[in-house]
Regions:
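Acidic-aromatic substrate-binding/catalytic surfaces of carbohydrate-active enzymes
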Residues: 2-83, 139, 285, 289
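Polysaccharide-binding surfaces and accessory modules of carbohydrate-active proteins
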Residues: 105-189, 603-611
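Aromatic/acidic polysaccharide-binding cleft in carbohydrate-active enzymes
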Residues: 220, 454-542, 557-560, 565
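Catalytic domains of carbohydrate-active enzymes, especially glycoside hydrolases
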Residues: 264-297, 305, 309-313
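Beta-strand-rich recognition/accessory modules
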Residues: 48-53, 87-90, 171-248, 291
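C-terminal beta-strand-rich structural cap/linker in extracellular carbohydrate-active enzymes
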Residues: 615-638
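Carbohydrate-binding surface patches
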Residues: 560-595, 603-605
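Extended, loop-rich substrate-binding clefts of extracytoplasmic carbohydrate-active enzymes
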Residues: 54-110, 192-194, 198-201
Length: 638
């Protein structure tokens, strides 16, 4: 049976919803799944999204079942109406009646929510996303609930706490001569800097985080909210061109060393990891990031497994160790050190984190009882003398930004990221690279030139700091907070992996880990995937190419369309190697003026259809390279 194109690109047969364009005059928006995205005036993005969202008690998304959708296109307006039904994990139902009106200079999104019985939720209502590119650091005016006005700026570096609270309206200059006011009605709104989670937006949301959650919407009681966007044109404005432009890439040399590539190991995948241990050496990974959690029952057997994997692969070992912090720290860490010694495992480095820090502490909440990080780090250094110590967070930058590790005790700082905390659609996942640039920039401002490691970071979520569990995804859908994501297994995952490495390259990361060895976060295909079971997934080749370039003199690849194509390069032994990823479902053509003989390797749909065999370099004379949907290219210039 011939695999479908969508399956090869995304690892799933589930199509993304087709957006419905709503427009009046020069104001337009896309309606997808009952929510608005890409709200533009005269071709310029004004808001990234306006969404009517419902979260369950664990911050998981309750998907909306949309019915009775109608769209009326009138001379001066476009009006959409629909009914939505949200279902909680316990079966409770929240019904919503929504109306969206688009005028030439205004947009109104009105929603009325009514539960059939008491409905437990962490959040129910509107979320408004302002874009970050061209907006970060720009002036903004905030009107508060009491009528007072605050003149400020959108945060430049990522703000750990809410930059604005008690918001009634937000006004900013979209482009010269155009102001946009977004007014929220029906509840108390505040803003968070969603770049903390690598979302490409500032989010204004309903219900302050300082209030208790989850909370209950009472049976039969209707909650009414509305968002009103108003455009004020102060001067004549030309329409912004939105047609694709040719992508010319330029190279910037001497960008420092590219990072070593790490691979994550997990005790719950020990059996499969032993079977695939040889793949680590083939890939060229130089570090094993070994997850060790005594609270999850990890002990001597897990450490012996890590030693066996290190012996087979020849890679250096970092023990990613949760510290229970229930007994004296010297006792707990001394016991772990004895087990490590008895196992014969030699540590190249050790990273520690209090177990309670795996869960996020939202703004306004009480911090859980925990020894000071200084004490944890000192105890780790006593238990493991001479072993370089890392710290930070095993969760995400959000938690590191809010609870900053004392760097004076650390040999390096570390954190992970995840692109599907809030949204899991293809566009949002690829837009996370806009924010990832600011994540690494913020880390460098906080920690200076301290050695810096990232990962394991994958599309799927390996732990949920915001609830009791991650989301199971047996049907292979695009689900926020899912513990497996089908796109990891397909071309999309390969493109995402390269784009991640390209985005963080400027931060001169020491070790970058973007995969585990086995399982849903790993390198090896299971049944029902775009490549044959037991074969390397497409991202394996990307990571192997990155490993080949690690330690080489980095080359930055600059384009005018970083939302469409990203890449990096290095020069080794007189050969320039460039890696490029297409972040879109459309073919993209890049033009490279660099002189020299060229060879091209391409991971694309055709490569998958031909069996995903070892990619072969072929001569490529043209300065143009066509990147099919979500393709990854390796260009060698001799």
């Amino acid at each position: 049976m011939t695999a479908s194109r969508i399956f090869l690109l995304f690892g799933t047969e589930e199509p993304e919803p087709v957006p419905r364009r709503l427009e009046a005059g020069r104001l337009s928006a896309e309606l997808v799944g009952g929510n608005l995205r890409m709200i533009r005036f005269s071709g310029k993005e004004v808001l990234r999204a306006v969404s009517s969202l419902v979260r369950d008690r664990d911050w998981g998304t309750c998907e909306a079942a949309i019915t009775e959708l109608t769209v009326e296109e009138e001379e001066a307006a476009t009006i959409a109406r629909y009914d939505a039904r949200f279902r909680a994990p316990d079966g409770a139902v929240l019904d919503c009646r929504a109306t969206i009106e688009v005028f030439p200079d205004a947009l109104i999104f009105d929603a009325r929510f009514t539960p059939d019985r008491d409905f437990e939720t962490a959040r129910a209502g509107f979320a408004i996303l302002h874009p970050i590119v061209g907006v970060a650091g720009r002036a903004v005016t905030v009107q508060h609930g009491d009528g007072s006005v605050e003149r400020s700026v959108f945060p430049d570096l990522i703000e750990p706490w809410q930059p604005f609270k008690d918001i009634a309206a937000i006004t900013y200059e979209v482009m010269p001569g155009i102001e946009a006011e977004c007014r929220m009605i029906g509840d108390v709104f505040e803003m968070e800097d969603q770049r903390n989670w690598t979302d490409g937006s500032y989010k204004t949301y309903v219900r302050p985080l300082a209030l208790p959650w989850p909370y209950v919407l009472k049976a039969g009681e209707t909650v009414h909210q509305a968002v009103r966007l108003s455009i004020r044109q102060l001067d004549a404005v030309a329409v912004v061109a939105t047609k694709p432009v040719p992508i010319e890439i330029s190279l910037r040399r001497d960008q420092g060393k590219l990072p070593a590539i790490g691979i994550g190991l997990r005790p719950d995948e020990a059996g499969d990891e032993l079977l695939e241990a040889g793949l680590i050496r083939v890939l060229g990974a130089r570090h094993l990031i070994c997850h060790f959690d005594p609270g999850a029952g990890h002990g001597a057997a897990a450490l012996r497994h890590f030693r066996q994997m290190a012996d087979t692969s020849g890679a250096a070992v970092t023990l990613e160790c949760f510290v229970p912090c229930r007994r004296p720290l010297d006792d707990e860490l001394g016991e772990i050190a004895r087990m490590v010694g008895d196992s014969g495992l030699r540590l190249a480095s050790l990273a520690v984190s209090p177990s309670v820090d795996r869960q996020s502490t939202p703004p306004g909440s009480a911090w859980p009882e925990c020894p000071p990080l200084e004490d944890v780090y000192q105890a780790a250094q006593r238990a493991f003398p001479g072993v370089p110590l890392g710290g930070g967070m095993f969760s995400y930058f959000t938690e590191l930004n809010r609870k900053r590790a004392p760097a004076n005790r650390l040999a390096y700082v570390t954190h992970c990221t995840n692109p599907i905390v809030h949204a899991a659609d293809d566009l949002s996942v690829m837009q996370t690279f806009e924010a990832l640039r600011d994540v690494t920039r913020s880390v460098r401002v906080i920690y200076g030139d301290k050695p810096y490691r990232i990962g394991p970071s994958t599309i799927a979520m390996r732990q949920n700091p915001y609830g009791s569990q991650t989301k199971d995804n047996p049907s292979g859908k695009r689900i926020a907070m899912a513990n497996r994501d089908p796109r990891h297994n397909a071309l999309f995952g390969a493109a995402w992996t390269l784009a991640y490495a390209a985005t963080v390259a400027e931060a001169e990361v020491e070790v970058l880990t973007l995969s585990t060895l086995a399982g849903p976060f790993g390198l090896v295909a299971g049944p029902g995937e775009p490549v044959k079971e037991g074969s390397p997934r497409p991202l394996f080749y990307v990571l192997r190419w990155l490993a080949e370039l690690s330690g080489g003199e980095g080359i930055a690849i600059e384009t005018c369309v970083a939302d469409r194509v990203l890449g990096l390069g290095a020069e080794l032994d007189g050969t320039i190697t460039l890696l490029l990823a297409n972040l879109t479902p459309n073919p993209e053509t890049v033009t490279l003026a660099e002189p020299g003989r060229r060879r091209l390797l391409l991971l694309d749909e055709g490569w998958l259809r031909n069996g995903a065999r070892e990619p072969e370099a072929r001569p490529h004379e043209s300065a143009d390279v066509v990147l099919p949907a979500y393709a990854v290219a390796r260009i060698e210039i001799l």
